[in-house]
């Protein structure tokens, strides 16, 4: 098969073609690794666990963001051709390695870190597993920040200020966490210039999430919460 791999850096690049032998149960990550090991040792790419737990191997495969370790070639091969590139909406560092700093910077900007209302010396709060807010918060805790949703989002592509699906989903998780002290601060963080109301509800984030999460539903929740907060006199 023919594999076209993007080569370059932040200053630009182009696709380079490789002839790669087909194998049974071959993943896209297997293909990239074979190229690096057998044809071009200078090819740069990122991976770690190889079993769909870390998300670090995410790349664009035939125009779609995917975990390459869980993407089998026989499901995505088009006319015996595979096109592999770094994640969209992030600046490339080298070849297939995308710079994740903008993604995590926006995660922090959206208030993604936990601000507990109690200290280690306080009694641990008892929250029932079937508590409504606990259930909502639990919906998104399997996010591993792979940035597939960020790469899939057209709003991110056209709005540099937009926080992105993963950051907003994390904010929704914290907003529904009873242990968070200042929930108004969460809403303030996602109500600004790049906040939740920039989302066009196209649903690409939900469609392509490898963990079957629903960032669009989380963003819709934030939209409703920020509007209610504003109506009640919040700023």
Give the residues covered by each predicted segment.
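Ferredoxin-type iron-sulfur electron-transfer modules in oxidoreductases and energy-metabolism complexes
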Residues: 26-41, 85-235
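Iron-sulfur-associated redox domains of electron-transfer enzymes in respiratory
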Residues: 1-104, 150, 154, 158-159, ...
